[in-house]
């Protein structure tokens, strides 16, 4: 009798592709399988797509109902896999994601090798990677080739390209008290951490043919993760996989409507798409809504404001208004007239006043506007709390900031400001030590 294969599909908010992933299992030439769809509390559209397939008795569905505020605390797909493995009954186990499909001969080919070679516990195949644009058009593709027998598979093999025995995963559990390591440090390479565990017992044997296809959408975690700094600067507009927009204000995320974006002269093209775990690690603050005109302390920081009948222009930071001394200073910091928010005089009057923002070159240690990008030779800095935080150029571009708008700062002035923690992206090594 053909052995049972257990497939674990992890799903989160990909209604346009999760159905294709499920159908790729249904269309397998090898028919003795069970599919566990582990959904991470996806949106309604995704869940409705999944529900269409649940009449099939071989398909099982579980929803995590995870709270958004808890989402960042573990590597969610690893957590879901750990919950699924004890539910499975197959002799062999493999994995699938909602942006990946199996080719029809995938299970048949892998089972054949594992059944023929009793000394082999893990097999892996080649994978076709299709990189897609926002309108789902292919802009590039590559093939991840097999590279012989892998004694160190971490970072070299995608988890949708693997099948392993139940026997070896039980060995992992005996040693570690669990299966996949779902520590949040492994968001980008959870499979690599698990492969390291598997490699302690057995190597990965290659099947040198393409057996699965993965799509790299603009909203794929790996693409959204790239060049996002560990700390997102205050004043940044962000969104996750949903269409809701937030402004990072004093390291909280504040929901803001498209109407209020226009009212406060934010620009939607400046919104930075980030992975949901990065978004939800920021506590949600008060929404940016009409109440800001009643309670001006709720106006987001890093806005230019002025009263309707006053010539004075102010910059908001730390919930105080800093008067910009004159037009020369306004231009020196590359402020723009179109960014000024016109408010009733009584609202402006209620905001506490602090120092002036004066000529950068005439007063060492002068108050710097928060969130201003500075350049000194080839180095870039963002200012916060009168400290200069180094920032990588790739991070600048990722945050939709403009290097062309950077304010030049002479070395003689730079030396008068202390340095803060850098805004940098540290690429997680795909090789787990």
Predicted regions, residues:
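Conserved nucleotide-sugar donor-binding catalytic segment
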Residues: 125, 146-227
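Acidic donor-binding segment of Leloir-type glycosyltransferases
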Residues: 22-69
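Conserved donor NDP-sugar-binding/catalytic core segment of glycosyltransferases
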Residues: 101, 105-138
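N-proximal low-complexity "stem/linker" segments adjacent to membrane-targeting elements
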Residues: 1-26
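Short, surface-exposed polybasic-aromatic patches that bind anionic ligands, especially phosphate groups
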Residues: 228-433
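Short aromatic/hydrophobic "clamp" motif used to bind/position activated sugar donors
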Residues: 93
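Active-site acidic Asp-centered loop
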Residues: 40, 96-98
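Glycine-rich, basic loop-to-helix element that forms the pyrophosphate-binding segment
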Residues: 66-88
């Amino acid at each position: 009798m053909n052995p049972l294969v257990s497939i674990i599909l992890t799903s989160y908010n990909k209604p346009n592709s999760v159905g294709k992933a499920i159908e790729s299992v249904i269309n397998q030439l090898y028919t003795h399988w069970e599919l566990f769809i582990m959904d991470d509390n996806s949106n309604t559209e995704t869940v409705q797509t999944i529900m269409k397939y649940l009449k099939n008795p071989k398909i099982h569905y579980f929803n995590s109902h995870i709270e958004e505020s808890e989402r960042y605390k573990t590597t969610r797909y690893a957590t879901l896999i750990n919950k699924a493995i004890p539910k499975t009954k197959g002799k062999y186990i493999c994995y699938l994601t909602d942006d990946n499909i199996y080719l029809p001969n995938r299970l048949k080919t892998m089972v054949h090798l594992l059944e023929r070679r009793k000394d082999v516990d893990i097999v892996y195949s080649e994978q076709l990677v299709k990189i897609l644009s926002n309108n789902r058009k292919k802009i590039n593709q590559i093939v991840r080739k097999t590279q012989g027998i892998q004694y160190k598979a971490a970072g070299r093999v995608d988890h949708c390209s693997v099948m392993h025995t139940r026997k070896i995963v039980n060995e992992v559990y005996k040693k570690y008290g669990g299966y996949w390591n779902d520590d949040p440090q492994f968001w980008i390479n959870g499979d690599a951490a698990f492969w390291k565990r598997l490699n302690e017992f057995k190597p990965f044997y290659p099947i040198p043919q393409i057996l699965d296809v993965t799509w790299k959408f603009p909203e794929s975690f790996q693409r959204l993760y790239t060049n996002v700094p560990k700390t997102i600067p205050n004043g940044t507009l962000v969104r996750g996989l949903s269409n809701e927009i937030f402004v990072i204000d004093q390291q909280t995320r504040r929901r803001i409507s498209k109407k209020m974006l226009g009212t406060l002269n934010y620009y939607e093209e400046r919104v930075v798409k980030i992975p949901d775990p990065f978004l939800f690690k920021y506590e949600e603050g008060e929404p940016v809504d009409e109440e800001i005109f009643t309670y001006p302390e709720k106006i987001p920081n890093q806005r230019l404001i002025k009263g309707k009948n006053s010539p004075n222009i102010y910059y908001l930071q730390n919930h105080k208004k800093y008067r910009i001394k004159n037009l020369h200073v306004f231009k020196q910091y590359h402020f723009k007239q179109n960014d000024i928010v016109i408010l009733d005089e009584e609202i402006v009057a209620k905001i506490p006043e602090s120092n002036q923002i004066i000529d950068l070159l005439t007063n060492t240690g002068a108050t710097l506007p928060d969130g201003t990008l500075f350049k000194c030779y080839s180095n870039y800095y963002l200012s916060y709390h009168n400290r200069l935080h180094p920032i990588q150029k790739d991070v600048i571009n990722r945050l939709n900031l403009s290097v062309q708008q950077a304010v030049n700062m002479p070395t003689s002035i730079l030396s008068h400001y202390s340095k803060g923690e850098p805004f940098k992206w540290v690429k997680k090594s795909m090789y787990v030590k």
